[in-house]
């Protein structure tokens, strides 16, 4: 069972952080992961800059549950944690909820790096996080109503996914115009 668990990483919308350094929260106190390993991985997925800007950088001490960090910053730490574990299976459960658009772009970049050559299950309301998925399964009221690639689903006349996509991206365009 331990071997199976070591092959799966989970990134959820509710990230738990220990009252300890960013480094220890990323490595989960694994003595086999060095600061150089962490920095290299952070650079690979594009989040080194955010961590380096914190007072003390990787040794910045967070309070329990990360109360001094934004939701997006906690998500980025969780992504780096998952990336370092190099799982065979990655589960992202609403990993981009409660974040701003700048952090979402960072997370999308990190996601593209993390999911390479892995089985990935992405549970999302933000369709921007799943556009490049091989297969999208669309649920409505707990029932599967459509499945396929983004291109296939967007071309279904009166499709549920197509309606969601149009609503979501129309809203994003309106927000962009207001800002």
Please place each PLM-identified region on the residue numbering.
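ABC-family ATPase nucleotide-binding domain "signature/switch" substructure
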Residues: 5-14, 22-25, 39-45, 59-156
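A short, conserved alpha-helical patch in the ABC ATPase nucleotide-binding domain
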Residues: 26, 30-31
């Amino acid at each position: 069972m331990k071997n199976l668990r070591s092959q799966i990483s989970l990134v959820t919308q509710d990230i738990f952080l220990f009252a300890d350094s960013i480094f220890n929260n990323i490595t989960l106190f694994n003595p086999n992961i060095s600061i150089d390993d962490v920095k290299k991985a952070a650079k690979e997925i594009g989040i080194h800059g955010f961590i380096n800007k914190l007072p003390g950088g990787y040794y910045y001490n967070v309070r329990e549950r990360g109360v001094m960090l934004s939701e997006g910053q906690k998500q980025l730490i969780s992504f780096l944690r998952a990336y370092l574990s190099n799982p065979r299976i990655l589960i992202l459960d609403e990993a981009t909820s409660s974040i701003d658009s700048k952090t979402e772009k960072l997370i999308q970049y990190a996601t593209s790096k993390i999911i390479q050559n892995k089985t990935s299950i992405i549970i999302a309301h933000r369709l921007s996080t799943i556009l490049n998925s091989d297969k999208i399964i669309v649920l409505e009221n707990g029932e599967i109503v459509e499945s396929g690639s983004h291109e296939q689903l967007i071309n279904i006349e009166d499709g549920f996914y197509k309606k969601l996509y149009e609503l979501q991206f129309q809203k994003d365009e309106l927000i962009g115009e207001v800002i």
